[in-house]
Amino acid sequence: MKKFIKSAISFTAIIVLCLSIAGCSLFKAPDKGSIDNIDDSKVLASTLNFATQNVSERKLLTGAEACALVERSVVALEIVYQGGTSYGSGVIIQNEDADANSKIFYIITCHHVISSLGTINVYVPDENGRNFTDGDYNSEYKFTGVIDNKIHTDKAVTLVGGDKDGDIAVLKLNTTGKNVNIVSANVPVEGYSVKKGEEVFAVGNPTGQLPGTYQDGVIGYIEREATINSVGIMSLYQINVDITHGNSGGGLFNMYGELIGITNAGSDENEGLNYSIPFEGTDSFVTVAKQLIATATDSNYGYVSGRWSLGITIADKTNFGLVVNSVETGSDADKAGVLANDVIVGIKYTDKNNQPVSKEVSSSSSFTLVYYEIKEFLTSGDKISLIVNRGSPINQTLELTLTQNIFCDTGFYPTAE
């Protein structure tokens, strides 16, 4: 049986929710075009590259040297939402072809850090490396924005896009009008690959009140499959670097001072067993971030092609089994006729061998196992059926067509030319 590993986000108020398979609230505007008119995100992302070091200047560094090189690229995040405040970390990056005097930067963080929505405060280390907890911190390095299903171009911090499955979100940082010096991180040069046993270090904001903290360790395993609480099954770097609440979204660096991972989870039960989203692979933070940036438009947020979300929350209830708590308006489940208080007893789908499959479900855990299994191969446009009971002897079968999921979807899409 797989254990759920806790994501390392720090909360000042915690609300326990049942399993949620949904994104930001949806608003659809059919007259504004269709998501089908947008090019595939992987094609668009292939034209983007993040900044790397000059190969001639690249060299192995001591821990102190590497930390000094990158620590100002790691920011502290504070999200004030209805019901509380949460904290996390993020890493500043730039496109490879960004102008040296550019006032626009990107911040990569974890999706679960910003998924509660609300006001977001970004605290960038100031020109002297001081952080927001220091009394003499330069407040010019504090930037504010709002995360919801509207585009806020008047804010210094704006959402570019978020991807729940990859646990990556990208923010845009606009420093126009401020006399600040921003340091961005570099991703590894072409040809580099992380090795097991390699020395690494993390910079983040443990507890939400200790920004700029350096913690070192090694890569324990390259492609460790782990089930991350509130995210799902992921292929991650296993590291023994200490990752605690508030570190989520922070940077994992190699001894060249290159950003090789985004820290996202740790285990409260097993000391030294922690995780980071890799820079390599199909769902690497580089791949996901590039797709989010490439597909973002003036009217809607970025996305990763093929991702879908049912749009329901579920819970186990005594004597009732698996019950739908709520259905998101406009979601795939809503369009199929799923109702709050429906009892889900089964799910039907076509597997990757094109064979029909029907599975019974009786609890949130059994439903979750099937859900993450089919997430591996079903994509937007595919169909599944939920078998539900509404108190009668005969069950009902509701067919859902899976549609592209956009976190904080504004409902406005480009119109076909």
What are these regions, as identified by a protein language model?
Residues 25, 73-78, 101-110, 156-157, ...:
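Active-site-proximal beta-strands of protease catalytic cores
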Residues 61-63, 259-320, 370-373, 383, ...:
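C-terminal cap/linker of serine protease catalytic domains
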